[in-house]
A protein has these predicted regions:
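Short beta-to-alpha transition helix within the HATPase_c
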Residues: 3-41, 91-93
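Glycine-rich nucleotide-binding loop
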Residues: 113, 145-152
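ATP phosphate-binding glycine-rich loop and adjacent ATP-lid/helix-beta elements
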Residues: 113-141, 169-170
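Short beta-strand/loop element within the Bergerat-fold HATPase_c
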Residues: 85-100, 108
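Conserved transmitter core of two-component histidine kinases
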Residues: 44-52, 105-108, 142-143
Length: 170
């Protein structure tokens, strides 16, 4: 329990450091790199990130940072990042509708041990199912496919992220 709690606090601290300047936003890609960086071997094959620059408000960055932290932790303990040759691929896009912009992303694990449906719902699953919808109106779906966990998530982007400049040092 202590280790999990410490990891969650570290994740929050990392995200807050990214947001130290209130007039700037942090990119979704940087939040991903912040959480997944320890597993990136530099080959561009173990961790694959693909998508446009998407600035996030502090609320979105903190909430998504926690979700990505939980996905990363589970991948490292039980999934594709727990074995040599395992891979995490995150693809994202922004769609522009009549009244809002929506960020959609897919987290896809492959090359890990066979996946089975968990016996109980862990913190990460509860975060995706209940916390993110309440905090940032996100909708997510988790598929425990035998060849790797897949997560699809969609969330509205606030209008203010359109005009906020991202930190130049990220």
């Amino acid at each position: 329990f202590k280790t999990a709690l410490f990891g969650r606090i570290q994740s929050l601290a990392k995200t807050h450091l990214l947001l130290s300047d209130e007039e700037r936003a942090v990119s979704f890609a940087h939040v991903l790199r912040s959480e997944l960086g320890a597993f990136d071997d530099g080959s561009h094959e173990r961790i694959v990130l693909s998508g446009p620059d998407v600035p996030l408000t502090s609320q979105l960055a903190v909430s998504l940072g926690m979700a990505i932290h939980e996905l990363t932790t589970n991948a490292a303990k039980y999934g594709s990042l727990s074995v040599y040759g395992g891979k995490v691929e995150v693809n994202w896009s922004v769609t522009i509708g009549a009244t809002r912009r929506t960020l959609s992303f897919d987290w896809v694990e492959s090359g890990g041990p066979p996946v089975t449906q968990p016996q109980r719902q862990g913190f990460g699953s509860r975060l995706l199912a209940y916390v993110l919808p309440g905090q940032i109106q996100a909708r997510s779906r988790i598929d425990f496919a035998s060849n790797g966990v897949r997560v699809h998530c969609e969330l509205p982007l606030p209008a203010e992220t359109h005009d906020v400049k991202m930190r130049a040092d990220l």
